[in-house]
Amino acid sequence: IYGPERNILGRIQSRNFTRIIKKGHFFSRIYINDLTNIILASMNKPNPISIYNIADDCPSTLDDVIDYISKKISIIISDEVLYETLSKKEQIESFFSENKKVNNRLIKEELGIILEYPSYKEGYNQIINLNN
């Protein structure tokens, strides 16, 4: 879950940021406004037997997200480390322990959801615009 108050833009802008690279590690995200709309839609169309995966349309690697943001705000991130080279204490296990691509088909079919932020690109464009 990310949005104006919860994102990695500030850490990248601080220029005190180390990129941790784990190839092939995908993660599904959702912008807070889309999450709110999905919750409201599920309350308005309750279906007790449905389980909804709440995610945008574009599972992506953290590296892809960081590349996109850094290019948009013209910051070069030179500090990077491969996840595999970190000691166990240094590993950010809560984020990197799972590798998930989530299918959001049911939120669209059953709830009629049209995502305002279908990928991290639209979401971070909004966050960057709000910070300018």
Locate each region found by the language model:
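Glycine/proline-rich active-site loop of Rossmann-fold NAD(P)-dependent oxidoreductases
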Residues: 1-15, 20, 33, 41-52, ...
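Soluble, non-transmembrane catalytic domains of enzymes that act on hydrophobic metabolites at membranes
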Residues: 6, 26-27, 33, 125-129
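Short, glycine/charged-enriched secondary-structure capping and boundary segments
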Residues: 8-14, 67-69, 116-117
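Residue-level signal for the nucleotide or nucleotide-sugar donor/cofactor binding architecture
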Residues: 30, 60, 102, 115-118
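Residues in well-ordered alpha-helical elements
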Residues: 33, 63, 105, 118-121
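Mid/C-terminal beta-alpha module of Rossmann-like enzyme folds, strongest
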Residues: 38-92
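Conserved C-terminal active-site "lid" loop/helix of NAD(P)H-dependent oxidoreductases
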Residues: 67, 86-114
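Amphipathic terminal alpha-helices
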Residues: 118-132
